[in-house]
Regions:
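Outer-envelope beta-barrel architecture signal
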Residues: 14, 75-79, 91, 102-108, ...
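Flexible loop and strand-edge segments within Gram-negative outer membrane beta-barrel domains
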Residues: 117-138, 146-201, 209-212
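Flexible, glycine/serine/threonine-rich loop segments and coil->beta-strand junctions
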Residues: 1-41, 48-65, 73-76
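Transmembrane beta-barrel domains of outer membrane proteins
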Residues: 7, 47, 67, 96-100, ...
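Short strand-turn segments of transmembrane beta-barrel domains in outer membranes
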Residues: 43-45, 51-55, 63, 68-100, ...
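Membrane-embedded beta-strand positions of outer-membrane beta-barrel proteins
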Residues: 44, 79-83, 108-112, 141, ...
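Outer-membrane beta-barrel pore domains and translocons
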Residues: 49, 67, 82-88, 100, ...
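Hydrophobic, lipid-facing positions within transmembrane beta-strands of outer-membrane proteins
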Residues: 2, 12, 60-62, 77-79, ...
C-alpha cells in the first residue's frame, strides 16, 4: 500500500482529503493514495503536525489534500490520453475529457484510469510473491458552475480493484493465496455563496458520501 508517514506515523493518524473533503477513512486508509491516479491530480498539499479540526478530527500528525483536475483549468484539454508501461510488467492507461459551456461558467470533466500488473515477482525465490498483482478500474465525472456570487460542484466516482498475492501457485500443491476485491462508490456536492457587498464573507455547504 502507498502511504506517507508524517512525524513517524501513517494510516489513521494522517488525514486524507480530496478537494478539502475528508476521504479514504477506515478500511480505505491503507490504500488511499493507490486509489488516486497521478494524471488526475492538479495539485497536492501536505501539512505536517496537528491541523485545524475544520475538516475533521483525524489529523493527529498531519493532513494530505489532493486537488483533482477541474474543467476551468486554463490548460485543460478537450481530450488527453496517456499510456505507461515498464519492465516489471505493469501497464497503465489514462484518459480525460473536458467540456466547457456557456462562457466557461458550466464545465464537466470525465476521468478514466486502468492499470494491471501482468508479471509475478519473486526476486528472493522464497515461493511468495514480493508484491501483489493488482488490476484497477477507476472512473470519475464532475460538473462545476461558477458565477460572481455562487459556485457549485457535483461529482461521482466508481472504483473496482483486485489484489492477488500469496504463494506462487506453481511452487506448491495447495498454495496460500490472498485475494482482495474492492468496490467503492463516492459522491460529493459543494456549494459556495458570496455576497457582493462583503467579498470576505461567504457561506458553504459541502456534502459527501461513499460506499466501500
Amino acid at each position: 500500500a502507498k502511504q506517507i508517514k508524517l512525524l513517524g506515523l501513517s494510516g489513521t493518524y494522517v488525514q486524507m482529503l480530496t478537494e478539502n473533503i475528508p476521504n479514504f477513512r477506515t478500511v480505505a486508509a491503507p490504500f488511499g493514495l493507490g486509489y488516486v491516479p497521478g494524471p488526475w491530480m492538479q495539485s497536492i498539499q501536505v501539512s505536517k503536525g496537528i491541523t485545524s479540526v475544520k475538516q475533521g478530527y483525524e489529523a493527529m500528525t498531519g493532513q494530505i489534500n489532493i486537488e483533482y483536475r477541474k474543467p476551468q483549468m486554463l490548460e485543460a484539454d478537450w481530450i488527453n490520453l496517456n499510456v505507461y508501461t515498464n519492465s516489471k510488467g505493469r501497464i497503465e492507461g489514462n484518459a480525460d475529457a473536458t467540456l466547457k459551456m456557456k462562457d466557461n461558467r458550466w464545465g464537466t470533466t470525465l476521468l478514466v484510469h486502468y492499470d494491471k500488473d501482468l508479471s509475478t515477482h519473486d526476486e528472493n525465490n522464497d515461493g511468495f510473491q514480493d508484491m501483489p498483482k493488482t488490476e484497477q478500474v477507476n472512473v470519475m465525472n464532475r460538473w462545476t458552475f461558477l458565477s460572481d456570487t455562487y459556485e457549485f460542484q457535483i461529482g461521482a466516482r466508481y472504483l473496482n480493484e483486485n489484489r492477488h498475492s500469496g504463494q506462487l501457485e506453481s511452487s506448491i500443491v495447495n498454495p496460500y493465496l490472498i485475494n482482495l476485491e474492492t468496490n467503492r462508490i463516492e459522491g460529493f456536492m459543494k456549494n459556495g455563496f458570496m455576497w457582493n457587498d462583503a467579498r470576505e464573507s461567504s457561506l458553504a455547504l459541502i456534502l459527501s458520501g461513499s460506499y466501500h
